[in-house]
Amino acid sequence: MVGSKMAATASIRERQTVALKRMLNFNVPHVKNSTGEPVWKVLIYDRFGQDIISPLLSVKELRDMGITLHLLLHSDRDPIPDVPAVYFVMPTEENIDRLCQDLRNQLYESYYLNFISAISRSKLEDIANAALAASAVTQVAKVFDQYLNFITLEDDMFVLCNQNKELVSYRAINRPDITDTEMETVMDTIVDSLFCFFVTLGAVPIIRCSRGTAAEMVAVKLDKKLRENLRDARNSLFTGDPLGTGQFSFQRPLLVLVDRNIDLATPLHHTWTYQALVHDVLDFHLNRVNLEESTGVENSPAGARPKRKNKKSYDLTPVDKFWQKHKGSPFPEVAESVQQELESYRAQEDEVKRLKSIMGLEGEDEGAISMLSDNTAKLTSAVSSLPELLEKKRLIDLHTNVATAVLEHIKARKLDVYFEYEEKIMSKTTLDKSLLDVISDPDAGTPEDKMRLFLIYYISAQQAPSEVDLEQYKKALTDAGCNLSPLQYIKQWKAFAKMASTPASYGNTTTKPMGLLSRVMNTGSQFVMEGVKNLVLKQQNLPVTRILDNLMEMKSNPETDDYRYFDPKMLRSNDSSVPRNKSPFQEAIVFVVGGGNYIEYQNLVDYIKAKQGKHILYGCSEIFNATQFIKQLSQLGQK
C-alpha cells in the first residue's frame, strides 16, 4: 500500500492474488513450497473474470498453478472428459445457461464453480436442476461465492469494472433523462463491487460522503449492505481474516466517497508524470500498453496495399523495477533515467564481451594464462548475471519504446506548453499568453487539446466569461476544428454547481520551468528533447486529496464539515455528521463515484509519502483518460 509498509500488512493486490490462487487450487490455500506436481486443470472464465485475473497473474503463473488451458465461457470448447474445470464467472442469466449446457454436454471430469459476485438462490437452483437432469450431481465438486468483483491495478489502486463500464460511467450517472430504476441499478452495481472490495480487504470501514450527490446514494446503500451482513453472525463475511494478516487490525479504515462533480478540471488536465502521460496519450488499458510500431517509410510498388503497422503490447507490472520507480516521475526525469540505464547496460555488456574474448585466447603465452586465472572468477559472476542482464535489456528496450512514443506526442502537440498553461489557470497564476492565442495557434495541439484547455479555463474561472467573450472563444474553437458539445454540458453543469457550492480550488502554482530540456540531456541521448520544457513539479493537493486530508486528519473545514458519517457497526444507524472518533485515521480508501484518473492517483501517492505509517487506497467506478471523458461530456452536451 502507499506509505511505509508494515511487515504484517498485505496490500489489496496481494489479497486479491491470494484469493485467486486459492480458488485455482480448488479453494484450498495455495502453499508456495509444496512439493509435487500441481493438479492439471482448465480455467473457464467470462470477460469479467479475465479482466480481474489478467493484471494479477501471468500465463506462466497460471501454468505453475496447473492451468493448462484458459478459455472464455462463451467460446466453442471441445470436451476434455478427464480434466477438472475451474469456473470463474459472474452469476448472470446468460452465464448460468451456458454453465448448465456444459453440464449437459459432460465437457469435463468435475466442475468447481466460482462466482465473482454472490449468486442468488434461484440461479443456484437452476444449476442444481441442470446437474440432476444431466446426472452430473457428483461431478459438481464445489460452488463458491468469491466476492472478487473489482479489478486491482496497483498495490493501492482498484477500479470496479471494465466490461459494461458505461453502466457505471460519469455519463450514466449524470444523464438528465435517467429514471429512478436505472439509477438504482447503477448504484447497486457500484455497491456490490465495493462490498466485494471490503470483504477481500477484511475490514468494515467508517464511511464519509458529500451530501446530495451520487456518492451519498452509494454510501447509504453500502452502509445498509454491510450492516445486514454483520447482523447475520453465522454468515458474516467479516468474522475471520482469511489471510491471517490483519491489514486494519488496530484501527478501522476510513472510506471517503466523493463525486466526480467536485472536480471536473483534473480529468481534462494535460499531465507531466510518466504513468499518467502513458494513459493520456497511448493505448494503456489494465496495465498493458499497446504501441503501433512504425515500420519506416518503404517504397511500396504502385498499386500495392500499404504496409500495416505492427502492434506491440507491453505489460507494465510491479515486477518492472524501472516502472515502479519512475511511474510517478516527471517525464524529463524518465527520459534521462532510461538513457542512464542504457549506458550502464552497455558498460556491463562490453565487460561480458571482453571476458568472453579473453576466454577464447590460446593458452600458450603466459600473459594470457595469468589474465585467464584473474578473469575466471569475473567471468563466472558475469555469466551468472547474464539472465539479469537480459531482463535489464528487455526493460530498457520496453521503456525506450514507450517513452519515445510519449515524447512524439509531447513534441507534436506541445503538451509541455499545455501542461504549464493549465497549471497556471488552475492555480490562478498570471498568464503570460492569452488563451485565444493558444487556441488559435495552428501548431499547438489537436482540436481536443484546445477543447480540454478551454474547458479547464471555463471550469476554474470564478466568474464565467461574458457572452461576448464566450462567442469569441467559441468561434476560435470552431475554427480550430473543435466539437462544442462538451462545452454545452459544462455550461449547464457550472450553472448548477454554482447554485450548489463554490468551485473547487486547486492551490498555488505547481510547476517551475527549469529551462529547456536539451541542456539537461546528454548530447548522445536517444531522446532528442530540444524545445521541450523541463518542468519540475511542486506538490500541491488536488481537491480529492484535500478532502481526504481534511477527513483523515479530522480537520475542520467548510468544504467537508457537512459530510455525512456512517458506521455500519453501530447498532442503530443514526446518521450523525459529527464523528464519535476524534483521532486521525491511519488508513483510508478514497473512492470516486463517476470515474477517476492517474493524475489524482499520483497526487494521493505523493501526498501520503510525507505521512509516516499511513496508507491510502484509491478507487474509482472506472478509470478514463481525457479523450474518453471528453467523449462522455460530448454525449451529455448533445442531449
From Swiss-Prot:
Pfam families: Sec1 (PF00995). The modification Phosphoserine is found at residues 34, 300, 525. One of its GO terms (biological process) is regulation of protein transport. Gene3D superfamilies: 1.25.40.60, 3.40.50.1910, 3.40.50.2060, Syntaxin Binding Protein 1, Chain A, domain 2. Keywords: Cytoplasm, Endoplasmic reticulum, ER-Golgi transport, Golgi apparatus, Membrane, Phosphoprotein, Protein transport, Transport. It is a peripheral membrane protein. GO terms for cellular component: cis-Golgi network; endoplasmic reticulum membrane; Golgi cisterna membrane. It is found in: Cytoplasm; Endoplasmic reticulum membrane; Golgi apparatus, Golgi stack membrane. The keyword Protein transport applies. Its main location: cytoplasm. Belongs to the STXBP/unc-18/SEC1 family. Plays a role in SNARE-pin assembly and Golgi-to-ER retrograde transport via its interaction with COG4. Involved in vesicular transport between the endoplasmic reticulum and the Golgi. Interacts with STX17. Interacts with STX5A. Interacts with the COG complex via COG4. This is Sec1 family domain-containing protein 1. It comes from Mus musculus. The gene is Scfd1.
